[in-house]
């Protein structure tokens, strides 16, 4: 069918109000009607009424208006009760209810995103401690989402991040956090540099082999925490951060450096360079510990706790990837390919010109931030910072060079860097003639 396309003017004729309509059983959620209004307007502006000659009718508005979800007011209204809140946590199907709840919390008179995050993550109540642990679930995605909301001052993203944390299915990391914190609190273990703890994980047959490929997506829950819980708790509890500004900043840099080390250090000789998809998130999420570390409304004790928990979970993820050998020369001696001759500015521009679902750009930005915040500590603490100086950019180049030629996520990364069979899926390295 040949048509002449004329851009339709935007008209304000698609605002729904949550009024009773024919055949309605329950009231509609205001959030649902707002979302439907937006979708109807987008359909009006972008999509034709006919998408093929025969029976090609646009049914999008019909579907939107017929399938409006009902308001779950009884659930949302009761969530201020910690027992009710906790009852609905860790259930993916409760995300919408938690989102509506946190939106309401943020819209309360005199409320703010800082006050809501403080109440539900940093008030040291049993519920807040559980919510704080949930921020680290799902390969750090809730804290990444929340971090963006705080960094860019977007309450809507804060609500989404909190709702994601509350509803995310569990890997049981809350039990791990509490056990490691309790053991560290006994004073029976001396504090050690994080780089030494990575080496402890690598040296432990129990930890290195706890996760199995057959665990699928549950290598943390069923592998490391399921088969080597006491061992990983004993190692992780040795990373301890004092509640003073200097130690929190130093420990944050230490965490960033070791996370980057776990990404740039592993390599299988004879294979193309690849960064591990899972360990990459340890770096990507690290930037938000700068964001949270600079938040004046978070106490220094809570900032220390945040960094402790992040570094301890990074150790778990390192073990979940079979604790690969980390060799400094794999990034210090790296010869760039596509990024040869680039600086940070040129690399940023290059990132905007190729196919990326956001993972590479977030990883590179986190490395740039780490380079900046690490600089004041690199001379005094060089021995505990495996990545420093030019190495931050080298690892960013590895990431860009190894992903830019691929559009499929499966080909951009190695999916379990310490497991030999996963390297079988990576092409052999071919020397250019």
Curated annotation (Swiss-Prot):
Q: What pathway does the annotation place this protein in? A: Secondary metabolite biosynthesis
GO MF annotation: an example? oxidoreductase activity
**InterPro entries associated with the record:** Questin_oxidase-like
Any idea of its EC number?
A: 1.-.-.-
- Keyword annotations of the record: Oxidoreductase
The answer to whether UniProt assigns keyword Lipid biosynthesis to this entry is no
The phenotype of cells or organisms lacking this gene is:
Does not completely abolish the neosartorin synthesis, but accumulates chrysophanol.
Please verify whether the record's keywords include Oxidoreductase.
Answer: yes
Q: What does this protein do?
A: Baeyer-Villiger monooxygenase; part of the gene cluster that mediates the biosynthesis of the tetrahydroxanthone dimer neosartorin, which exhibits antibacterial activity. The two different monomeric units appear to be synthesized by the same set of enzymes, among which the Baeyer-Villiger monooxygenase nsrF is the key enzyme for the divergence of the biosynthetic routes. The pathway begins with the synthesis of atrochrysone thioester by the polyketide synthase nsrB.
PANTHER family per the UniProt record, alphabetical: BAEYER-VILLIGER OXIDASE MDPL, PROTEIN, PUTATIVE (AFU_ORTHOLOGUE AFUA_5G03330)-RELATED
Give the record's family classification. Answer: Belongs to the AflY oxidoreductase family.
Protein's UniProt name: Baeyer-Villiger monooxygenase nsrF
Supply the source organism for this entry: Aspergillus novofumigatus (strain IBT 16806)
């Amino acid at each position: 069918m040949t048509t002449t396309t004329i851009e339709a003017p935007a008209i304000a004729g698609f605002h729904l109000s949550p009024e009773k309509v024919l055949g309605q059983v329950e009231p509609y959620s205001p959030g649902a009607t707002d979302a439907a209004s937006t979708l109807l307007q987008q359909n009006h502006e972008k999509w034709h009424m006919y998408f093929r000659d025969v029976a090609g009718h646009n049914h999008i508005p019909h579907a939107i208006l017929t399938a409006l979800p009902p308001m779950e007011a009884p659930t949302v209204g009761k969530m201020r009760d910690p027992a009710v809140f906790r009852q609905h946590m860790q259930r993916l199907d409760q995300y919408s209810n938690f989102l509506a709840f946190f939106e309401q919390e943020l819209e309360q008179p005199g409320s703010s995103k800082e006050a809501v995050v403080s109440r539900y993550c940093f008030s040291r109540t049993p519920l807040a401690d559980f919510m704080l642990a949930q921020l680290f679930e799902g390969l750090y995605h809730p804290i990444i989402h929340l971090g963006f909301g705080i960094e860019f001052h977007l309450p809507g993203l804060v609500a989404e991040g909190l709702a994601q944390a509350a509803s995310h299915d569990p890997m049981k990391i809350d039990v791990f956090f509490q056990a490691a914190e309790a053991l560290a609190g006994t004073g029976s273990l001396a504090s050690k540099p994080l780089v030494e703890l990575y080496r402890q994980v690598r040296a432990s047959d129990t930890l290195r082999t706890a996760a199995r490929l057959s665990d699928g997506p549950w290598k943390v829950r069923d592998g490391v925490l399921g088969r080597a819980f006491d061992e990983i708790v004993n190692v992780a509890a040795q990373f301890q951060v004092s509640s003073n500004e200097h130690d929190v900043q130093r420990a944050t840099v230490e965490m960033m450096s070791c996370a980057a080390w776990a990404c740039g250090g592993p390599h299988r000789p004879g294979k193309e360079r690849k960064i591990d998809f899972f360990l990459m998130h340890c770096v990507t999420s690290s930037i938000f510990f700068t964001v949270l570390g600079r938040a004046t409304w978070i106490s220094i004790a809570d900032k220390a706790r945040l960094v402790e928990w992040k570094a301890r979970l990074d150790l778990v993820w390192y073990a979940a990837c079979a604790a690969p050998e980390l060799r400094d020369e794999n990034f210090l001696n790296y010869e760039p390919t596509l990024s040869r001759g680039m600086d940070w500015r040129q690399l940023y521009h290059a990132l905007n010109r190729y196919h990326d679902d956001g993972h590479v750009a977030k990883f590179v930005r986190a490395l740039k931030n780490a380079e900046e915040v690490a600089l004041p500590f690199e001379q005094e603490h060089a021995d505990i910072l495996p990545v420093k100086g030019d190495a931050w950019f080298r690892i960013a180049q590895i990431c860009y060079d190894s992903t830019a030629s691929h559009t499929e996520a499966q080909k951009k990364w190695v999916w379990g860097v310490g497991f030999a069979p996963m390297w079988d899926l990576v092409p052999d390295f071919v020397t250019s003639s």
